[in-house]
Amino acid sequence: IRNSSYQTIKGLELKKFIDQLDYLKKNYNIISIEEITNSLMHKTKLQKRSCLLTFDDGYKDHHKYVMPELMKRNISGCFFPSAENIINNNVTETNKIHFILDQQKNSDLIIKDINNFLISKNFKIPNKKKIYENFEKKFIKRYDSKKIKYIKFLLQSWIPDPLKGDCCTFLFDKYLKVNEKEFSKKLYLSPKEIQEMINNGMTIGGHGYRHLRLGDLSYKNQLKEINLMLNFLKKFNIKKKWIMCYPYGSFNNNTKKILNKKDCLFAFSATP
């Protein structure tokens, strides 16, 4: 990150990752997904201080840097790529927001551009105070500044689909001035790299198709999102005993019903 063109992206330098890995290896019992599966199926206890390594979003760095370090230590990890950006070589809305904020430090200008975009689409902007009240409740635990939280709330939650995707693309094109497909190929894993990771003992799970907040979707739209994700996993012969990590940690009872019907072993969330 330090030597890249995007130096304010929130990521971890390789040296710090190696230090963290060595700390975990020394102080915890790093386990595999098979050990968790056996524990759940046979109702046996895991060893004390057990630790499972998981990596979301399917970044190319996971193949280039993470996998080799895990293999050096004879440990495995679980990787959860989102499907659409790998299939269609686009950039997820979440990552577009990260790079927009990296390239344009003036939050007021971003907010102005968002408002102008919405106006151009004849989308009425409600009272700003009401928006602030809503996002404060939802994003209160974020460490970003108030304006950054506001921007993320607008682009991730408040603006409806498909308008929010169009808005993210508009801002991404304006501030980064790059070819999205080529940018995506450099950012995310390729199918070949995913297969190499599987061949080297890594576990691949589902992370949605478009990386949407499942808990905000209707049953019908969740089912569509999960079916598309499963079609992606089948390309790697992942058909049974599959696992999932919820994008944003978001899910509801409908999500759990669908996963049960689809024979999902279990799913991970960022929230209890």
Where in the sequence are the language-model features?
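Catalytic alpha-helical scaffold of carbohydrate-active enzymes acting on polysaccharides/glycoconjugates
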Residues: 1-243, 248-272
